Amino acid sequence: MSEVVIICSSSDPASSNIASRLLELAEWDEEGTLRFHRSYCMLCIEGELVGLRNLEDMLDRIGLSPRLIIFASRHISKEAVPWLGGHFTGVVREGSFELSRPAPYALKKLLMALQRHAPSTFRLSAEATHHGPVDLRTPSLFAEIGSCEQHWIDPAAGAAVARAILELESYEAHADETVLLGIGGGHYVQRQTELILSRPVAFGHMFSKYQASMLNVEAIKKAADLSGASGVYLDGKSFRSDERRRLEEIAASLDLNVMGIKEVRSL
């Protein structure tokens, strides 16, 4: 049984780079369009990963019922900074939201592995939840290379992400750690990344300060339930007092413990 499914796209140069490095780093058995290694299955598709719908139905039809789905992908940024990282998927808009199930412990292990394997010129971080797929019931994450063509095809960057992915079989090793939602910070959620890498804590869905005003009680409840979160980290530098109070009141109504950076660092 393949417990971890890796989805790659032939139209994405970073995804193809990661797939090539995975094939080099491990021995894979080929069955049609699928590749198998231990409990991993790698599937390459055509087209964009972010627009996939009903992926689990397609996987079920070919006999795959994974416990974790990993999307190997490029990351695009106007700044063209060399970057490695990962994030969960979902879209939050004013008055509506769609969220897939995140994999908090897998993202933590991915970032810890990338910290060891990343080329020295590449920055590392998680990102706030964004884009699709938005309908996944299986825990999932994106593992990415950024931020331009030069970086997407860099073999060392591809190898770093591939090595990190190959360490995710045992991501439950962190399953006794506290899981929090994260709200605040920029898109690259630097303080949440620091906490993930330094403290016995994992993060489920993370939302930037730019998304915070669109989070209502239903969105936060859904994010917490999907993440298995027992609390909410609120980034202290991100909110006016009235906005922070609104978020604290929502968290209290959902019995979620509100924590700042000092409280999380003390864990």
Curated annotation (Swiss-Prot):
Keywords: Hydrolase, Metal-binding, Zinc
Cofactor binding notes: Binds 2 Zn(2+) ions per subunit.
Reaction catalysis annotation: a D-aminoacyl-tRNA + H2O = a tRNA + a D-alpha-amino acid + H(+); glycyl-tRNA(Ala) + H2O = tRNA(Ala) + glycine + H(+)
EC number from the UniProt entry: 3.1.1.96
Similarity annotation: Belongs to the DtdA deacylase family.
Assembly mode: Monomer.
Protein name per Swiss-Prot or TrEMBL: D-aminoacyl-tRNA deacylase
Organism taxonomic ancestry: Archaea, Methanobacteriati, Methanobacteriota, Stenosarchaea group, Methanomicrobia
